[in-house]
Amino acid sequence: MTLTFLLVVALCMLTTCHTENYRDSQKVSPVRSIGKTQFARSLRLSERYCVPKSGLCTIFQPGKCCSGWCLIYRCT
């Protein structure tokens, strides 16, 4: 892990990242307050399943984002 990645994780933990609108049938409630383990799990699930509700996705993962926002997944 790089220092930048750790910094992003630390900052993102201070925000909210909602994970919903999954492509498969799995239903997961929005994550409002996430810890390290939940963040890691949320990040992996987001890379695989999260799709934007509207707009463009920016920062690190173009085309992949959560319906809400955090520093890694952002819908604008």
UniProtKB/Swiss-Prot annotation:
Statement: the UniProt record of this protein carries the keyword Disulfide bond: yes
Keywords: Disulfide bond, Knottin, Neurotoxin, Secreted, Signal, Toxin
Location(s), subcellular: Secreted
Propeptide stretch(es), residue numbers: 20-47
Annotated S-S bridges: C50-C66, C57-C70, C65-C75
UniProt key word Transmembrane helix: no
Listed GO MF terms: ion channel inhibitor activity; toxin activity
Organism superkingdom: Eukaryota
This protein's GO CC annotations: extracellular region
Pfam families: Conotoxin
Tissue-level expression: Expressed by the venom duct.
Leader peptide range in chain numbering: 1-19
InterPro entries: Conotoxin (IPR004214)
Domain notes: The presence of a 'disulfide through disulfide knot' structurally defines this protein as a knottin. The cysteine framework is VI/VII (C-C-CC-C-C).
Name of this protein: Conotoxin Cl6.4
Organism the protein comes from: Californiconus californicus (California cone)
Lineage: Eukaryota, Metazoa, Spiralia, Lophotrochozoa, Mollusca
